[in-house]
Curated annotation (Swiss-Prot):
Protein's UniProt name: Prohibitin-2
Highest taxon, organism lineage: Eukaryota
Database matches in InterPro entries: Band_7, Band_7/SPFH_dom_sf, Prohibitin
Residue list for modification Phosphotyrosine: 128
Length: 299
C-alpha cells in the first residue's frame, strides 16, 4: 500500500516546491496511519488469539488474552478462537444389550481448551466441533448403551447418563475439548418394543386388579362369617336369658317404649299413641306377672 502511494506521487505532475512537500507529507501520514491500523487488533471478551507468521507457522508459545494487541503487518496475522461454552444437540441410533433399537439424543456443552489452541489449530482448524463432536459422541453412545438392556436404560437412566458423561469427557480431552455438561435429552425405542411394553403394563395392571378383587372377596367372606357368628352367639344368649327369666322380654319392651317416647317428646309434631302402639300395655296380665317375677329374681 505504501509503495503504491509513492508510485502515485511519482506520476503526479511537478508543481510548486511547497505543494510537492505537502503532498509527500500527506502520503507519508497516510502510510503511517495504514501501518498503525494494520499493526493493531482487538481480542473480544470470551475469545483468545494465536499468531501465525509466514516463516515459522503457528507460534506455539503465544496465546493472546482479551484486549488490544500489536502485530507485524503482512508477516503476522492473528487467528481468533471463541472459548465460550456452546451447546450442541447430537442424536444417534444405537442398539441395546438385548438387541433393541434405541434412539438417544445428547445435549453437549463444550469449549476449546485455551491452553492448547496452537496445537488444536494445527490438528483441527477452526471448525473443530464439526470434525470431532459427532464422531466421539456416536462412539461413546454405542459403547455405553450396549452395556444395558432396554428396560435398564429407563430404570437406570441416571447411571447411564453418568457413565456417558464420564467416558465422553475423557474422550474429548484427546482433542483439546472441555465438556462442561452432558445430558440425555431424548430416549425412545422402536414402535414394536413400545407396544410390547405397553401391553405388559396393561397385563400387570389387570393382574393386580384381579388380585385386589380376590382379596376383597376374602375380606367380605370373613366379615360375613364373623357377623353370622356374632348373631348366632347373640341369639343363643337371648334364648338362655328367656329360658331363665321370661320377664326379660318385658324389659326389652320397656326400653323400646322409652326410646319411642323420647323420640316423640323431642319431635315438633304432636302425636298420640296408645299403649299398644308403644309396645307397652300395662293392663296386660302376662306383663304384670313377668315384671313381678323379674323383680323377685333381682331380689
Amino acid at each position: 500500500m505504501a509503495q503504491n502511494l509513492k508510485d502515485l506521487a511519482g506520476r503526479l505532475p511537478a508543481g510548486p516546491r511547497g505543494m510537492g512537500t505537502a503532498l509527500k507529507l500527506l502520503l507519508g501520514a497516510g502510510a503511517v496511519a495504514y501501518g498503525v491500523r494494520e499493526s493493531v487488533f482487538t481480542v473480544e471478551g470470551g475469545h483468545r488469539a494465536i499468531f501465525f507468521n509466514r516463516i515459522g507457522g503457528v507460534q506455539q508459545d503465544t496465546i493472546l488474552a482479551e484486549g488490544l494487541h500489536f502485530r507485524i503487518p503482512w508477516f503476522q496475522y492473528p487467528i481468533i478462537y471463541d472459548i465460550r461454552a456452546r451447546p450442541r444437540k447430537i442424536s444417534s441410533p444405537t442398539g441395546s444389550k438385548d438387541l433393541q433399537m434405541v434412539n438417544i439424543s445428547l445435549r453437549v456443552l463444550s469449549r476449546p481448551n485455551a491452553q492448547e489452541l496452537p496445537s488444536m489449530y494445527q490438528r483441527l482448524g477452526l471448525d473443530y466441533e464439526e470434525r470431532v463432536l459427532p464422531s466421539i459422541v456416536n462412539e461413546v453412545l454405542k459403547s455405553v448403551v450396549a452395556k444395558f438392556n432396554a428396560s435398564q436404560l429407563i430404570t437406570q437412566r441416571a447411571q447411564v447418563s453418568l457413565l456417558i458423561r464420564r467416558e465422553l469427557t475423557e474422550r474429548a480431552k484427546d482433542f483439546s475439548l472441555i465438556l462442561d455438561d452432558v445430558a440425555i435429552t431424548e430416549l425412545s425405542f422402536s414402535r414394536e418394543y413400545t407396544a410390547a411394553v405397553e401391553a405388559k403394563q396393561v397385563a400387570q395392571q389387570e393382574a393386580q386388579r384381579a388380585q385386589f378383587l380376590v382379596e376383597k372377596a376374602k375380606q367380605e367372606q370373613r366379615q360375613k362369617i364373623v357377623q353370622a357368628e356374632g348373631e348366632a352367639e347373640a341369639a343363643k344368649m337371648l334364648g338362655e336369658a328367656l329360658s331363665k327369666n321370661p320377664g326379660y322380654i318385658k324389659l326389652r319392651k320397656i326400653r323400646a317404649a322409652q326410646n319411642i317416647s323420647k323420640t316423640i317428646a323431642t319431635s315438633q309434631n304432636r302425636i298420640y299413641l296408645t299403649a299398644d302402639n308403644l309396645v307397652l300395655n300395662l293392663q296386660d296380665e302376662s306383663f304384670t306377672r313377668g315384671s313381678d317375677s323379674l323383680i323377685k329374681g333381682k331380689k
